[in-house]
Regions:
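Catalytic beta-strand/loop module used to bind and position nucleotide/cofactor moieties
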Residues: 1-169
Length: 169
């Protein structure tokens, strides 16, 4: 794993969480780089960090937030709004998220599969550059977790954690 792989690490966890939610009837899209949304409302977030010693990962940390029964801010949604009450217990979803982390550990060995599955779950097909306001078509996700963009003959990529790119979000 390279330093620029922190973004792919986060997407791997987001994908595993999305799969876990889907297995319980909740369809969540991946809002690059680190959120899960239902419609346009945020259900969960992922904060990845890889700690390196030289070129080797020494420690992988992941922060996971999932709205289950809690009050949510405007623009958010909780599982209690999506599932019957008996299926919205915090301890139950703690277990489901631990299972998602185990699944992410398995997925990490297959970055091409992660990218393909994450691309199918992307929240939109075009984005506006926050700095310029220009609209870009989303072409996919790079093996380092970058969001790949095209505007006519121009291409760029956005990265959120580590690595190098033409543009940043």
């Amino acid at each position: 794993i390279r330093d620029s792989s922190t973004g792919l690490f986060g997407l791997t966890v987001a994908l595993a969480m999305a799969e876990q939610l889907e297995s319980h009837g909740v369809s969540a899209a991946i809002k690059w780089p680190n959120d899960l949304i239902v419609g346009s409302r945020k259900l969960a977030g992922v904060l990845p960090k890889l700690v390196f010693r030289g070129h080797h990962v020494r420690l992988a940390r992941i922060g996971v937030g999932l709205n289950v029964c809690n009050p949510v801010p405007q623009g958010g949604i909780a599982l209690r709004e999506l599932l019957p009450p008996g299926r919205c217990r915090v301890r139950l979803w703690q277990l489901h998220m631990l299972l998602a982390l185990e699944r992410a550990n398995q997925l990490a060995a297959h970055p091409q599969r992660v990218v393909a599955a994450a691309e199918q779950r992307l929240w939109c097909r075009s984005v506006a550059d926050p700095a310029s306001g220009e609209h870009w078509a989303v072409c996919g996700i790079g093996l380092d977790g970058q969001l790949l963009l095209r505007q006519g003959t121009r291409t760029t990529s956005w990265t959120r954690w580590g690595g190098r790119s033409d543009g940043n979000l």
